[in-house]
């Protein structure tokens, strides 16, 4: 593949460019936040097409935040579109009411391009994966602690790599190359994440680490905010997605979102190879990536282990065979995909 799949990301790290969210904060729009939702969305979509300008008005990020909070009145952040009035404390499908952070730390186990990564894990998830290795986070949306947006912003600013001498910037446990929003899944906490970024001033890339089951509306709000999508492409068909993650209409939603997200930002696509699912899932996913996503990095992952409720599903109630993983990598290499190593 021509060019580096993460060239813009590296320009930010090298101080040659600005993180997208900072540019969105500087993009001024003339808006009355008391307008109805349709008018606000219309303004939002038109603002995406215009160059940033500096006149009196309101930050484009503030408009995004207002729309995100309005979505909590009848929650449609993810494609379950449960309609819960989360703004009034009603629980939706994910069970998340207020943002709770399960943990936050400098992660050294992500893809080489990302480490050290300041990873913020939210409790709760939009999926119900029977093999979830983070089930203690994803299935307990009331666990973890609440933090103010300002507090999280200050924590991010404390991790910015540019604060440290150049000889300390590689694999140093005290700073990060990026902010990595994850869970569970971060989608349920999108309004809070936008609040955090409103309070933050660090020129640091933002990574959206997600199952990509969010709505088009949520994805629009991330446009101009996220620098790298770190996606989790789990299944190659709707049957497996419904059976193992209770995710209806999976292929249409996740394929659509990958296409849209790739237009917005750079991308690393993760695929965890599942036992017994190379032909039904791994092969079609890798084929689809090769045909539909240009200049992305792909991580074919072998980390599967039977966890959570996997014992109730015969084909995945065992570790992944090395021959299965090798076959998936062979397929990816045969397609010319840019693999992470």
Predicted features along the sequence, with ranges:
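N-terminal [4Fe-4S]-dependent radical SAM core
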Residues: 42-122, 130, 134-141, 167
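A local structural micro-motif
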Residues: 140, 207, 338-341
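Pocket-edge positions in alpha/beta enzyme catalytic cores
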Residues: 144, 246, 317-320
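Auxiliary Fe-S-binding modules of radical SAM enzymes
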Residues: 1-88, 262-267, 271-341
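Generic domain-boundary/flexible-linker signal
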Residues: 86-89, 131, 140-143, 190, ...
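Conserved AdoMet/S-adenosylmethionine-binding subsite of the radical SAM
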Residues: 151-314
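Extended interfacial segments that mediate partner engagement and assembly in macromolecular machines
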Residues: 102-127, 133-166, 174-177, 182-187, ...
